[in-house]
């Protein structure tokens, strides 16, 4: 019996000609492509925070979201209602996974002990729902940024008491993620950075960040948590300069501190653009370095300089993103988590469904186009030809390590005329459009 979303029935696939806004046009979860269903390929996940806890408040105005639990006043009653609403939502939109922060699902108490007690009550409730729901936990994480105690950071705080509290909070978050069957655990350092170097010991902060992550690895082993650890890069906001700036930055950090064997990255589209990178750039860099773990599927507004967390509807973007996932061989434990929120003016409960339908359709269509691009080898063939000079002759000597500066100088002196070929960017973009518009 519907209790929270009475106006919405189960969302079904009706095809691209459907005029029903509450139906999938391109996402058919049961459609089989290359031996796997679309549901298995895409591994969609619902973000608990944006979907069930966000209220539309911004720095200029109060809450706008109309939610069926808004009449409640007790924080625990609200938390319980959100769990009920969440699983009704998961069922109606046929979501395979969801993700959560610890403070999304249960309110903070006056003490850490009271907060953990609140978590235990809500986690027990979620476990009961998981017994009969198809929806599972993609990943869990700890909110180490909202409370004022994290004003100077969490594991990178100048205050050792905050470091200790953060460790206790992550310890509990790891325990409940394991208890709920989470397949990954994410670290996003929203406050792990600085505003000015005039008061910052960067070396100590980075060392402490690494110590913290090693402690997490050790505790995960101790409790038998076998999920994948993920770090989510973001260059700024809320901190001016965050230590997990982009994939390359994170990878250098992990390698320096001997953490690369334990961590992969969770890449968010809007974070990539804040770092002045294409989404595909971050995915490609992670893929070729073997650290692409999971994706936060959203998009930003290119005219705004902050994290807008909009639902992804650009087919070109989703195609190029899924191109990288397919080239990787698909997701293992990761997936596509909609770290996206409806706009402040899209305040009715039904808008939650409409936003997710738009995002799921966009990635389903993008996957199909990307699959055809990979299968046809469109870009691979061109790239192989473009770099053909490294297949034999002096190029082969360079790649094999046979060449050195002396031999290369000798070659250059004997071959003074260099002939380059066109990169054909415009042609390739036209081919991409051809696939986008016809597939």
Swiss-Prot record:
GO cellular component, one term: cytoplasm
Transmembrane segments: none
Signal peptide start and end residues: none
Broadest EC class assigned to this enzyme: isomerase
Places the protein is found: Cytoplasm
InterPro entries given in the database record: Xyl_isomerase-like_sf, Xyl_isomerase-like_TIM-brl, Xylose_isom_bac, Xylose_isomerase
Required co-factors: Mg(2+)
Protein name according to UniProt: Xylose isomerase
Binding positions (Mg(2+) 1): 232, 268, 296, 339
Oligomer and partners: Homotetramer.
Gene: xylA
Enzyme Commission code(s) on record: 5.3.1.5
Catalytic activity: alpha-D-xylose = alpha-D-xylulofuranose
Cofactor binding remark: Binds 2 magnesium ions per subunit.
Pfam hit, one: AP_endonuc_2
Family, similarity comment: Belongs to the xylose isomerase family.
UniProtKB keywords: Carbohydrate metabolism, Cytoplasm, Isomerase, Magnesium, Metal-binding, Xylose metabolism
Active-site residues, Swiss-Prot/TrEMBL: 101, 104
MF-aspect GO terms: magnesium ion binding; xylose isomerase activity
One BP term from GO: D-xylose metabolic process
Amino acids binding Mg(2+) 2: 268, 271, 307, 309
